[in-house]
Design a protein with these regions (language model features):
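Amphipathic C-terminal alpha-helical segment
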Residues: 132, 143-166, 179-182
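Residues in the recognition helix of alpha-helical DNA-binding motifs
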Residues: 50, 60, 172
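Amphipathic alpha-helical linker/stalk segments
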Residues: 21-25, 31, 59-87
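Short helix-capping/turn signature of helix-turn-helix
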Residues: 51, 107-112, 149-152
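Amphipathic alpha-helical packing segments from all-alpha helical-bundle domains
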Residues: 89, 93-106, 111-144, 170-181
Length: 182
């Protein structure tokens, strides 16, 4: 009995890992159960036995991704003047490590209700903590710019589209935030 439970757990993990890889390459909205089953090396009925619907699979995938590389927590950032730099550096480093998956998931969240729901569930509270924590000493206009700069599209534009090094992207974001006074 114990061996069977271990095999089922291994199969489940293999399915979730295959789905996460597909979500990072084609996106959750375009990932089909057939694609996941093939990538995991299981039959479709095995996949359905573990994940009877798309929501259960997406929740498992997002849970695994966040467990393996949790988004940065503001509690770990220093107080005072270095907080904004530390926070943006941590968020941007997390985006860099999760670029493919984040890019596909956030793209699909624009058009796929379930992806949007699960993204909000997994990342919404943390993103709000980033904004509240870093935005506390800022005026309303600066907080608005902070919200933009904390977004994945801003990071991608600064680093990928503009070719800035990570520390340059953080410095540019800080200048944009601090330079926008109400």
């Amino acid at each position: 009995l114990k061996r069977r439970a271990e095999q089922q757990a291994e199969t489940r993990l293999r399915i979730v890992e295959a789905a996460v890889a597909l979500h990072g390459s084609v996106g959750p909205a375009r990932t089909t159960y057939s694609m996941v089953a093939e990538a995991a090396g299981v039959q479709r009925h095995t996949l359905y036995a573990h994940f009877p619907d798309e929501r259960s699979l997406l929740l498992a995938c997002s849970g695994l991704a966040v467990e393996r590389d949790p988004p940065p927590e503001p509690a770990n950032w220093p107080e005072g003047a270095d907080r904004l730099r530390a926070g943006l550096s941590a968020v941007y480093a997390w985006y860099r490590r999760n670029e493919d998956l984040a890019g596909c998931v956030l793209r699909d969240a624009e058009v796929h209700d379930l992806t949007r729901e699960v993204s909000e569930l997994r990342l919404g509270p943390t993103a709000r903590r980033w904004q509240e924590n870093l935005g506390a000493p800022l005026d309303p206009v600066q907080r608005a710019v902070l919200r933009v700069m904390l977004g994945f599209p801003a990071w991608r534009s600064l680093v990928r589209d503009s070719g800035l090094a990570p520390e340059q992207a953080v410095a540019a974001a800080i200048r944009a935030i601090e330079g926008s006074v109400a």
